[in-house]
């Protein structure tokens, strides 16, 4: 178990450093968690794995804190292979742009682009259909109008 715990700690440190750089923060994973908590529900809907990612981040941070601060934990079964795999996977997701915040950013950009394209299409449709003009007055109506002008 000692090797697994040490491997986990090293991978967690890599993830923490990446989160610090990614979020321009001194807090790393803790800041990522805080920003997830501050993210509005309307944005969370873009990420199918939002709740799982949030819970897993909190869990791996807890595991790391146990290993770092509790006496005798390095020789016990605190961390699992799944914990190690998840930390590595989340690191890779940040690197390849599929972490929750990047997914939200991409989805909102696509939404904005779609809205812009729809607006342009609407404007093009309006431009293709000229405004309906008033029907030209009949000869009789023009004659009556001219007579009225003559007497007024």
Short names for language-model regions:
Residues 1-47, 51-62, 66, 74-152:
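Amphipathic alpha-helical interface elements
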Residues 69:
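Histidine-centered active-site/metal-ligand motif
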């Amino acid at each position: 178990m000692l090797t697994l715990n040490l491997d986990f700690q090293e991978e967690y440190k890599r993830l923490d450093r990446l989160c610090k750089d990614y979020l321009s923060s001194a807090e790393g994973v803790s800041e990522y968690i805080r920003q997830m908590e501050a993210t509005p529900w309307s944005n969370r809907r873009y990420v199918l794995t939002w709740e799982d990612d949030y819970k897993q981040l909190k869990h791996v941070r807890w595991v790391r804190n146990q290993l770092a601060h509790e006496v005798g934990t390095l020789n016990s079964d605190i961390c699992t292979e799944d914990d190690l795999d998840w930390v590595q996977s989340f690191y890779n997701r940040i690197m390849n742009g599929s972490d929750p915040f990047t997914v939200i950013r991409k989805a909102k950009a696509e939404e904005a682009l779609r809205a812009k394209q729809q607006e342009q299409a609407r404007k093009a449709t309006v431009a293709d259909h000229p405004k309906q003009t008033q029907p030209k007055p009949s000869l009789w109506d023009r004659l009556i109008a001219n007579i009225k002008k003559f007497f007024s």
